[in-house]
């Protein structure tokens, strides 16, 4: 909700501080004041050309997140937020395209190739959803996510 640095600052500059204020109000009401990494929501921007913002944090405060699956988690959450939005939206209010920044590449210091791998994996898993939930699948997904070069054991 603190949209005053990096890509967030550019978003606030473009849409105005009213958007940041509404994002913060949503976080206060829906997340008791702290939106966890790995969650996301869609909010109206008030701009007809760019009608929605998906708020999907990659960190609570600025810090290095290289070596984690945070980029995957934030991307996955953003995709799920769009999916949820589209399930209940009227046809003319559905989100049909999304622009993502290189999540975690700024102050998070995740290398661009790792960002791309984690975001691509989230997308591929989203468009090819699992058909069962079991330990084999969970272990496989974990191995997929941490096979990106962002993971440094």
What are these regions (language model features)?
Residues 1-153:
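Macrodomain-like recognition of ADP-ribose-binding/processing modules
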